[in-house]
Amino acid sequence: MFCNLSPMIDFDALKSEKGLILAVVQDQLSREVLMCAYMNREALEKTVETGITHFWSRSRQQLWKKGETSGHVQKVKEIRVDCDMDSLLLLVEQVGGACHMGYRSCFYRNLEGEVVGEKVFEPDEVYKS
């Protein structure tokens, strides 16, 4: 286990919707928000067990380990639960980029569509079919 989460909050105590809870992922040092994704019980348990983020893909309907294809993993340093117990904050050490579009953060555009984030890799080179 990556950190002292004992006793871990029971997933059933969290206010999930259809068995999923929102997870906000933030860089531990810079506090930059990297991404948001959903976790089910298995994803949270795998994350705690391995220290690497795991999420539930709503589109593929399956568990996925962040960085499994790209190598751009998120090493979990701390997990916090919000006051309403309906979302999680994961403080991580990001290896490479968090966004599958090649940016450090999934929040790389402003409302006008202007790119304001840092591109850290070329997706075509990482996600070869």
UniProtKB/Swiss-Prot annotation:
List of residues binding Mg(2+): 82, 84, 86
Q: Which reaction does it catalyse?
A: 1-(5-phospho-beta-D-ribosyl)-5'-AMP + H2O = 1-(5-phospho-beta-D-ribosyl)-5-[(5-phospho-beta-D-ribosylamino)methylideneamino]imidazole-4-carboxamide
Q: Which coenzymes or cofactors are required?
A: Mg(2+); Zn(2+)
What is the first-listed, main subcellular location in coarse terms? cytoplasm
EC number of the protein: 3.5.4.19
Sorted alphabetically, the Gene Ontology cellular component annotations on this record are: cytoplasm
Alphabetized UniProt keyword annotations: Amino-acid biosynthesis, Cytoplasm, Histidine biosynthesis, Hydrolase, Magnesium, Metal-binding, Zinc
Q: Where in the cell is it found?
A: Cytoplasm
The reply to whether Zinc figures as a keyword in the UniProt entry is: yes
Q: Which residues does the annotation say bind Zn(2+)?
A: 83, 99, 106
Instruction: Please verify whether the record's keywords include Zinc.
Output: yes
SUPFAM superfamilies, alphabetized: HisI-like
Cofactor annotation comment:
Binds 1 Mg(2+) ion per subunit. Binds 1 zinc ion per subunit.
- Entry similarity comment: Belongs to the PRA-CH family.
What is the annotated role of this protein in its UniProt record? Catalyzes the hydrolysis of the adenine ring of phosphoribosyl-AMP.
Assembly and interaction partners: Homodimer.
Q: Would you tell me the protein name for this molecule?
A: Phosphoribosyl-AMP cyclohydrolase
- Source organism per entry reads Methanosarcina barkeri (strain Fusaro / DSM 804)
The gene designation is: hisI
